[in-house]
Amino acid sequence: MENGGYIVAIDLGSNTVVAVVGTKTEDGKIRILDKEISTVQGAGMVRGEIKNIDLVSQSIKNAVNAIEERMGIRITEAYTGISGQHIRSVKQPYYVFASRGDEIRQEDVRQLHDSMRNVPAPDGEKILQIIPQNYIIDDKEETANPVGTFGNKLASTFNIILGDTVAINRLEMALKRVNIAPLGLYLNAIASGEAVLTPDEKEEGVAVIDIGGGTTDVVVYQDNIIRHVGIVPMGGNVINKDIRSYGILEKHVESLKTRYGEAMRDAAQPDKYITTPGLSAKASKEISAQNLAAIIEARMLDIIDFAIEEIKKSGYHDKLGAGVVLTGGGAQLKHVDLLFKSYTGLDARVAGAESNLDESSLESAGSPALTTAIGLLMKAYEDRAQNKTINRSRPLSPRPATKEQLSNTGVKRNLNDFYQRRQNINEGTEGGEGGEGGEGGNNKTKKTTIKDNKQEKPSAIKRFLNRLRDYLEEDEIEDNEI
């Protein structure tokens, strides 16, 4: 909502809806005027996708109503973000010839971009964003700024982010059901990246891993360009499921995890025990701090494995000069950055949007759990300054491509695909980026770049794969019962 100089952004997560109202200060910082976090009840959102529109709409309404009452305003418009395992990233090349002589002009760059926007998207999908990579002049010279260079042919490979039409429509329906018009739709992963990164990190090479409840979003930057976006259909909820296996009531699991949990078993106190209420006073449950940490560590390592796989698919995993930035609700667990660093050998830090917040908002809005919502505000202000609008049905290819032609570089659609991919890797039959037509070159070299510094895994990979498959099957059963 744009009224009185402020904007409203709504982040729809698997577990919570985060609504924020913010404005931009004269020095370019975001000032948060109000915020509200509302829990998504039941299975309203599953791995980032709306499954029950009534439950999600009610959560939106709860968050928005609370802000309206405190601020004395009426919210009728908002910017929002999207995630989910339906999101996929593909690469598409295109070129144009110089319009005048042998010099590349701004109009040639504009024509190149417009050409990518004026063709139909594959059936059942919409384009969320089109991101040009480096430009190539006459098939030889590569440059980030082609205007003013000499040449006859301007080419680029575009990183195209696609989303499922049904999932996008459901998100917009959930907003409209509570009388909120969607002003713009952004990819959560990119919004989070904009919120937590510095310009130097984007230039040197960095990966942002946003650990949510149902999904983990991964975005890779290099030379200040978004090189890859991937969605892992696994988040902090897998930790909750294992904690429940100790007999802990579901309503106590999240608070137990966030208040007492640690991401490294060795850091937990060996003689500490936590007691939680049971169904009756006599049925209280007890769990040791080390067992709780062991559960968290095991599941976090699973998430890290798949996040690293997405980073490797970018072809830039050995060029991350600034390491990895962890954010999202799952990044608030103690020692998660140390676990990541010790396991992968990559530098890692946990961050919220502090570097982009006004000083008055640091204490109230600096949490990693608010990163995406603040990033949505930043993207909205950026596009408004450029007089841009979000086109949610941008086209894809100059020669309309089929889904089959595009799917080889897409994000895996569900955990069964991840299971099979991991199994192939362990059997030595799966290649890396280069093995499936990627741009990465030697697969074995790529695999060892990150894993050379890994510590030995704490558990057998086959047991993990079986648990992962069981997790997917249980989720499918629960979805069918709702």
Language model region names:
Residues 163, 262-264, 319-343:
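Glycine-rich phosphate-binding loops at beta-strand->alpha-helix junctions
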Residues 352-403:
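Glycine-rich phosphate-binding/hydrolytic loop that grips phosphoryl groups
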Residues 187-194, 238, 355-358:
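Short acidic loop-to-helix transition motifs that present clustered carboxylates
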Residues 10-16, 82-83, 200, 208-215, ...:
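A short acidic Gly-Thr/Ser loop motif
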Residues 74-84, 314-329:
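Short glycine-rich phosphate-binding loop at a beta-alpha junction
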Residues 1-16, 20-206, 249-250, 255, ...:
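Nucleotide/phosphate-binding catalytic cleft detector across ATP-hydrolyzing
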Residues 9-10, 19, 80, 175, ...:
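Residue-level signature of catalytic and energy-coupling elements of molecular machines
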Residues 177-184, 275-317:
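Adenine-nucleotide phosphate-binding core of ATP-dependent small-molecule kinases
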